[in-house]
Curated annotation (Swiss-Prot):
This is Ion-translocating oxidoreductase complex subunit G. It comes from Yersinia pestis. The keyword Kinase does not apply. It comes from the Bacteria. Part of a membrane-bound complex that couples electron transfer with translocation of ions across the membrane. One of its GO terms (molecular function) is oxidoreductase activity, acting on NAD(P)H. The chain crosses the membrane at residues 9-29. GO terms for biological process: electron transport chain.
Length: 209
């Protein structure tokens, strides 16, 4: 009887150890797959705001943390540096439009260091479906209108919605949202013009984690 119980106990222990090991292996493989997919999605997003022909480095590996009120608030925002021939040429930077109709709007803006916008995407918002949500690339191509635009300075009158005398369309029944996004993209592009002297002093994203 005792031998039988001992044998069953050993069997159960071996089974438990095997199950635990298998679970650990599955979890490890799953985590690696999820991380890989997340990296691919991030790379695709970066390429939408800084087209791949503009750089030859690994932008994801050159992630830095910036904090400046020009980015909508004093929260840390991430910046991904683009290089060509080892020279900094542009960046993709997170920024916030704090004055959206339904709250803050989070964006990723790509621009060079001379005021030329390369691309922009809304990455988080709570705008009203059918009205303010046209800022989302999945709903309309309105956000693409910033690509190729140049910002000359803070007093550049073109950087406003048409209702305010600027160059960008507002939405029918929704002016607050596009106005907020136009301002945020403009401010991000202006901020990037000031960035090159600071690059060597920026903390990396790894240091921020």
């Amino acid at each position: 009887m005792l031998k039988t119980m001992r044998r069953h106990g050993i069997t159960l222990a071996l089974f438990a150890a095997g199950a635990t090991g298998l679970t650990a292996v599955v979890n490890s493989l799953t985590e690696n797959t999820i991380a890989h997919q997340a990296a691919l999605q991030q790379k695709a997003l970066l390429d939408q705001v800084v087209p791949a022909e503009n750089y030859d480095n690994d932008m994801q590996a050159e992630c830095y943390v910036v904090t400046d009120s020009a980015l909508g608030n004093m929260a840390p925002h991430r910046l991904y540096l683009a290089r060509k021939g080892n020279q900094p040429v542009a960046a993709a930077i997170e920024t916030t439009a704090p004055d959206g109709y339904s709250g803050a709007i989070q964006l990723l803006v790509g621009a060079d260091f001379h005021g030329n916008v390369l691309g922009s995407r809304v990455i988080e918002h709570h705008e009203t479906p059918g009205l303010g949500d046209k800022i989302d690339i999945r709903i309309s191509d309105w956000i693409n209108h910033f690509s190729g635009q140049h910002v000359t300075g803070d007093d550049d009158k073109r950087w406003a919605v048409k209702k305010d005398g600027g160059s960008f369309d507002q939405f029918t029944g929704a002016t607050i949202t596009p106005r907020a996004v136009v301002r945020a993209v403009k401010n991000a592009a202006l901020y990037l013009q000031t960035l090159p002297p600071q690059l060597s002093r920026l903390p990396s994203c790894g240091e921020d984690q």
